[in-house]
Amino acid sequence: LNIFTNNLEGLVLDHRYYAGGCSPHYIVDTRFRKPYNVESYVPETTGKYEFTMTEYNSYSNYESFVLKAKAEQSGFSFGIKIPGVFELGYSSNDNRFQKFIQRMKRFSSTSSNFIHARSELAVGVYKLKPQSLMLHYEFQQRLQQLPVEYSYGEYRELYRDYGTHYITEATVGGIYEYTLVINSQELQKAGYSLSDVQKCAQYGFNIGANIYQVYGKLGITEAGCKSLLKEIGDSTSSKRFVEDFIVLVRGGASEHITALAYRDLPTAALLQEWGDAVQYNPEIIKLKAEPLFQLVTPRDLAQAAAIKENLQRALEEFQLESSSCHCAPCQGNGIPFLRGNKCECLCPLGYSGPACETSKRTDAAVNGNWGCWSSWSSCAGGERRRRRLCKNPGPETDAGSACSGPDAETLAC
């Protein structure tokens, strides 16, 4: 796993090695043999097809809490010791993520409101043994070929081919989420609030719920909820309140993902089918990870201490090199990302060109984006420090949103 891009890279562990053992496990009714490296696999049945909903009254708030959480885990500090469980973000190369971003970014300069809904289904948790792991033969050969005298270029190639971390524990399953883009002005004219839309959607989407039996408890009339839900659930209607309905799905067979993505309002039966498909086609949704250098032991390498130290040193350089902060800003609030060692822009709908420079729109305010972190300071008082500036680009005065996240970090030393 490349923790900076969310790309799954080459195999570092041999999951076809069984050490002569035969430990049968089951996924639903499918029997499989547990590999030597796996300590445990526990089936899960959590998730009830219920949606957790959150309101955002501006695009900048939505972007800070939803979009940037999906893009990349770029805030990890040097040492890259990731604490606890975190959600696997989307790679910028993921076609699902690209389409989602392109549709969402076109609302970056509007006064729209947003409702983000999410339903998570976990089907299993697997955990690796804490030590004595069997390395994949090709990865072990690459480690043995690394020079004892530090040469960043050769260590960088290892990280490019195999990623920066290996997954020690993972929750597999599926996530169905959608975003409602609401015309705040029309909503206000009709006397509705964003909370009214959320309440109607909450009851209307949850499996087994009948909105017309509970409308009295919502503080909104039956006619009001019918009007709002019709716009969400009918892609052919002329929509006054709902500007867009954007779906993003992980896990399940491709035909079910396609069906969900092209239906405005998924039915209970379709969600159940998707859930059944997730059992046999899950994706990693949460994980724990350790840096690759933790796999370097004297058991596998004669010069283990030197190689491990070199890998740690190279990881800091690789993190700086892998960041899109080196890229020039994209226009129209496009997102810069690295494809290999080349900067590219993911443009919002309505923008095109290498830097998203071609558009007929003139209303897009420029939002701020972080520049690169500075180098770590020398150790003083048991701490090292580094800073970054919101100038890549800086936010447009009185219109663009500022960068989210801290502008300084400290590290014990």
Range-by-range predicted roles:
Residues 100-101, 356-358:
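A short, polar/proline- and glycine-enriched secondary-structure boundary/capping micro-motif
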Residues 1-331, 337:
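Membrane-permeabilization and membrane-interfacing ectodomains
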Residues 238-245, 327, 338-342, 348-349, ...:
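Thrombospondin type-1
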